[in-house]
Regions:
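Juxta-kinase regulatory segment immediately upstream of eukaryotic protein kinase catalytic domains
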Residues: 1-27
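Conserved protein kinase catalytic-loop anchor
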Residues: 225-227, 245
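Catalytic-loop of the protein kinase fold
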Residues: 227-229, 234
Length: 357
């Protein structure tokens, strides 16, 4: 959290109204999780207190709105991207689905409490496949048995299929569809193209132009639209015994084709294998096998996902442009840096486009 005793006391007071029966609250052990991304600031901490005359403690997670421009494009006008949209989506999914979501403590829109909007949720214990270094090169995934690796990926795809069964209207998530907009792939393509062009300004990005031209000529029909996670990948799941204990990071949630989520999942599989030249470990299913796993869990046929995999890589390349713009604005990189143009996301996109050139 931000430095300063006063803010810690304000968080204590805020928690005192939300941790039922807790008195004498103290906060300790603040730390940032390993592999934190570029969106909302995250802090893990422990709250100790008394309840019914007995000492107790609870591990919690604080997510603060970043002062920087949001990483993702705004799906719903009037809703902040980083914190607001994520808390609302998680609340709806906890109430209207069996998707594993962390228990929520509360959401605060009043920036006077900690200087920024924030929410607090309970900590969910488990392991997370990190991407620096890649989990396909070291860590628990490499140490796992081939059977457990396969079981883990299959379980993640089962959770994704379960998410896609959620009726967004019954769950109260219809606010994710702006008035007058037909949700689906065509709308998402428009949204992301506008987002990337705005971030590029007058700079040229030939690979983005090539990808957009290819995508525009091949917009598929959507099987249906549903709640899309927006950042579906193993690294956004907390795993326990190779099973999803908690899905995280819903900043990019939208109402779109379920194939958009699956394409993002498969693009990230490419990103941790072919993009860096890392061989698939024994037991790891191929992308075709993963598509079949998802189809079996979803109970529907899933066709060629090349469009959605390339669309995913295009979005990822656009996100890097946005993140690099933020980095330059903060004075952390020089204005003439070219990471926005040359990075692992563009390598991934280029490799995918080579297959269709």
């Amino acid at each position: 959290m931000a430095d300063g005793f006063d803010e810690e006391q304000q968080l204590i007071a805020w928690l005192g109204e939300r941790l039922q029966g807790a008195t004498g609250i103290a906060l300790t052990d603040f730390r940032r999780p390993q592999g934190s991304g570029f969106s909302a600031e995250t802090q893990i901490f422990t709250a100790t207190f008394e309840r019914d005359g007995r000492p107790a403690s609870q591990k919690l997670v604080l997510r603060l709105e970043t002062p920087d421009p949001a990483v993702y494009p705004q799906q719903a006008p009037g809703y902040d991207v980083e914190i607001d949209i994520q808390y609302r989506a998680m609340s709806a999914l906890r109430a209207h689905s069996t998707v594993p979501i962390a228990p929520l403590v509360g959401y605060e829109t009043d920036a006077s409490v900690l200087g920024r909007p924030f929410f607090v949720m309970e900590f969910v214990d488990g392991v997370v496949p990190i991407e620096s270094p890649l989990y396909t090169t070291q860590g628990f995934f490499v140490d796992a048995s081939p059977a457990d690796r396969r079981r883990m990926i299959d379980a993640g795809l089962r959770a994704l299929a379960e998410l896609h069964r959620v009726d967004h209207r019954a769950a109260g998530l219809d606010w994710l569809v702006p008035e007058g907009v037909t949700p689906g792939t065509a709308h998402q393509l428009d949204l992301w193209e506008q987002y990337c062009r705005r971030e590029l300004g007058d700079r040229e990005h030939p690979l983005f132009e090539e990808a957009m031209a290819w995508l525009r000529a091949r917009i598929p029909d959507d099987p249906f639209v549903t709640v899309c996670w927006g950042d579906a990948r193993p690294g956004n799941i907390i795993w326990r015994d190779f099973t999803p204990a908690c899905l995280t990071d819903f900043e990019a949630v939208s109402i779109a084709s379920p194939d958009q989520d699956l394409g993002w999942w498969l693009m990230f599989d490419h990103w941790v294998h072919e993009t860096p030249g890392v061989e698939r470990l024994p037991g790891e299913p191929t992308r075709d096998e993963q598509r079949e796993m998802y189809a079996a869990h979803a109970g529907r046929e899933v066709g060629d996902l090349r469009f959605h995999e390339i669309f995913a890589a295009t979005r990822y390349a656009a996100i890097v442009v946005r993140v690099m713009n933020r980095t330059v604005a903060r004075g952390l990189m020089p204005p003439d840096q070219t990471v926005w143009l040359h990075n692992p996301a563009t390598v991934c996109l280029d490799l995918m486009l080579r297959d269709v050139r």
